[in-house]
Amino acid sequence: MQIQVKLDKGYLPDEYAKYASVKEAGNPVVSFPFTLTDLPEGTKYLPWSLVDYDSIPVCGFAWIHWLASDVPAVSEIPADFSRTTNTPQGYNSTVSRFLTDPEEVHTGYIGPTPPDKDHDYHFRVYALSEKLDLEQPYYYNEFLRALKGKVLAESQVDLPARV
């Protein structure tokens, strides 16, 4: 299984990251498009996660940017999928009890906004033969627990975003 995300000069394009023109509460909200190839036979659903581990020195924890589950298996996910789908999506890190702005986005895609230097965002897609059936919205730990014993294949790509 392979993931393809088009980069611009080696970085996630600005329209999906820090310099996006479409934002909510200062955060980019238009999710990036991607293509999947070589899905294993029997794949019916595609959950994924987008996590920034380079945020640990900045805020003390890995920043969750996007969780999606029970997406019917397709080879192409269009731009802005997060805001235009009824697919179950989990909490991103704006739900943190350390963030107090009620206007911030709490579920779905929140684009990269590296504050200190370029960051690599770990985008992992899983191929499943059955749904995760998570109660929406859900947390990353619940997402990971639900994956156990259900993964046919998985693939990861690191998406650099510029400061």
PLM feature spans:
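N-terminus-centered regions that define maturation/targeting leaders and the start
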Residues: 1-163
